Amino acid sequence: LINVLLVDDHELVRAGIRRILEDIKGIKVVGEASCGEDAVKWCRTNAVDVVLMDMSMPGIGGLEATRKIARSTADVKIIMLTVHTENPLPAKVMQAGAAGYLSKGAAPQEVVSAIRSVYSGQRYIASDIAQQMALSQIEPEKTESPFASLSERELQIMLMITKGQKVGNDSNLLIV
């Protein structure tokens, strides 16, 4: 039997997930928390195998709660279930100690599959999120300055231009 803790600041979300999991053989919702602090306390004092954690909550959010739970109760597996799927967040969450990452738009069967996978010791990342993470490694977003790719000489010329100096063929200015 897989004991699951639901953590979300929206009662309606918790009730919906609870309802989905009620009918699943081998999975039992053993508790709920509406904030990260309560989730951390709950995991330290109760038997829980898997935590379905929301990212954005009052107080400490899902990322910090994941760090704290992963540090203090290594046997508890955490799945981030969130609307925030853009990079670099999934990687940060996994580095913080989560075993899984799902979008709140996931199908109920995918949530069940994720719970079973992380309980068995595997990691689970929704395929669309995993693809996005992989692509960001191949094609990192252009976040550095456009001047970062200039040679030292090209940078000197750019600085001269910004100071209003004429560059032309003046070898004295360019120190050729």
What are these regions (language model features)?
Residues P88-Q95, G100-E152, Q156:
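Short, flexible helix-to-coil linker/hinge segments that flank and couple to helix-turn-helix
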Residues L1-V13, I17-L21, L150:
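Conserved acidic segment of CheY-like receiver
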Residues E32-V50:
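Acidic, metal-coordinating helix/loop segments flanking the phosphotransfer/catalytic sites
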Residues M57:
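Receiver (REC) domain active-site loop signature in two-component systems and cognate sites
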Residues C35-D38, I60-E64, T85:
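Acidic catalytic/metal-coordinating carboxylates
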Residues K41, L63-D75:
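Short amphipathic alpha-helix used as the core "switch/output" element in two-component signaling
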Residues D54, T82:
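Active-site residues of response regulator receiver
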Residues E144-V176:
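Helix-turn-helix DNA-binding segment
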